[in-house]
Design a protein with these regions (language model features):
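Amphipathic, small/basic residue-rich leader segments at the start of a protein or domain
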Residues: 1-87, 98, 106-111, 328, ...
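C-terminal helix-coil-helix/basic helical segment that borders enzyme active sites and/or dimer interfaces
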Residues: 24-32, 260, 264-271, 287-321, ...
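A short, Trp-centered hydrophobic/proline-enriched beta-strand micro-motif
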Residues: 115-123
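A structural signal for short hydrophobic beta-strand segments in well-ordered beta-sheet cores
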Residues: 136-139
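Glycine-rich phosphate/cofactor-binding loops in nucleotide/flavin-utilizing enzymes
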Residues: 70, 91, 337-381
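Glycine-rich beta->alpha junctions and the first turn(s) of the following alpha-helix
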Residues: 3-6, 11, 77, 192-291, ...
Length: 381
């Protein structure tokens, strides 16, 4: 049952208060220690923020995707690692669920929604992109797959309990033969290496993974052989790209807030910056940029809810547009602050670093353009 408007507004107000209050305390701790405190995971789980988009009969809040995005905009105004936790936990259950058996749903989906297990989306490889050129492979022997290969840049790959991992049957090419597997981190033949710290999104762990004939039960495969990329692309990446687009909107909104606040109080030559047309016009451009990206993102979400086949392409359009918008907005926001904005612990300095990561998350701008171009040129034929 959809949440009514009054209850939704109450929830949104609660989340905004959390983001601007305790969320900022967590942000300061993360920036100081370069680690996400375990208490943040517990707090987000106990508040129900890690299961907002999951159905009520799964233990979630049952919020429809387009409304959930309005909440994601709020979370994105906080520290990027806080936003990342909410984003990943509200997305991975859906990728697992679409082709899960009842047994798999009980073993993986419901515990993940409840916050009892953590699952990392495990697609990217050192020598492959983010699609059908997977090189990690499995050999089937009876009721067991033996997994060999490498993965890297895996968000929460160090601390997860399971990897939702994509590989291919030995000897296959393209999307044929791809499989989606739930791999237990305690399986034999696994080496986990934490990657060096990133420029932004401090505190979020990323892993390099090596699998050397790691046994995975066939019962841990989602769907059939050949459906691996269906799980990855349709079940996760389309919605995740839309969610990342809205994350860009939220982060840009916070950057704009900081720029406006600074412009109203900072004086030069007897005038506040806001009284100078060059500054006022930059802020006006930001406002229009943010709203345009917000509306395209919501449009993509609603088309996905309507089962429109164009939703995949629209998700790439939304992500491309929102990322480019965020780049412009954060650059202007930092410029409004002047040199002082370049120093820690000014919040705009952190936002500027965090914003750059969005150009990579869930596919680079070049990948999004490739997806869009294939669609429009294919349609033209």
């Amino acid at each position: 049952m959809a949440i009514d408007e009054a209850a939704f507004r109450q929830l949104a107000n609660e989340i905004e208060a959390f983001v601007r209050g305790p969320g900022e305390d967590y942000a300061e701790e993360i920036e100081r220690t370069h680690a996400v405190p375990p208490a943040l995971w517990v707090d987000l789980r106990d508040r129900g923020y890690l299961s907002l988009a999951a159905p009520e009969d799964y233990g979630g809040r049952g919020i429809e995707f387009s409304r959930y995005l309005e909440l994601m905009e709020l979370f994105a105004m906080s520290h990027a690692s806080l936003r990342m936790i909410v984003h990943v936990c509200n997305g991975t259950w859906r990728a697992i669920d679409q082709l899960a058996t009842d047994e798999q749903r009980k073993a993986f989906v419901l515990p993940q929604v409840a916050g009892d297990i953590r699952v990392a989306f495990t697609l990217t490889e050192p020598t492959a992109g983010t699609g059908a050129d997977l090189r990690s492979s499995v050999e089937r022997e009876g009721d067991t797959y033996y997994l060999s290969g490498r993965k890297h840049l895996i968000t929460f790959g160090v601390t997860s309990d399971y990897w939702l991992l994509f590989a291919r049957l030995e000897g296959t090419r393209g999307s044929d033969g791809t499989v989606a597997l739930m791999v237990d981190r305690d399986s034999p033949g696994v080496t986990v290496e934490e990657m060096p710290e990133t420029m932004g999104v401090r505190g979020t762990d990323h892993a390099r993974l090596l699998f050397e004939r790691t046994p995975v039960p066939v019962t841990s495969r989602l769907g059939q052989e050949g459906q691996g990329l269906e799980v990855a692309l349709g079940g996760f990446l389309t919605l995740s790209r839309i969610s990342v687009a809205m994350s860009c909107v939220g982060l840009a909104r916070r950057a704009q807030e900081l720029a406006v606040e600074h412009a109203r109080v900072r004086e030069t030559f007897g005038k506040v910056l806001a009284a100078r047309q060059a500054i006022a016009f930059a802020l006006a451009e930001n406002a229009a940029d943010i709203e345009a990206a917000r509306q395209l993102t919501l449009h993509a979400a609603r088309r996905w809810e309507a089962a429109d086949p164009a939703a995949g392409t629209l998700s790439s359009m939304a992500k491309l547009t929102a990322v480019d918008m965020l780049t412009r907005v954060t650059d202007k926001a930092l410029q409004v602050h002047g040199g002082i904005g370049y120093w820690e612990p000014n919040p705009i300095e952190r936002i500027y670093r965090d914003a750059r990561a969005q150009r990579f998350e869930e596919g680079t701008n070049e990948i999004q353009k490739t997806v869009i171009a294939r669609d429009i040129l294919g349609t033209a034929r």
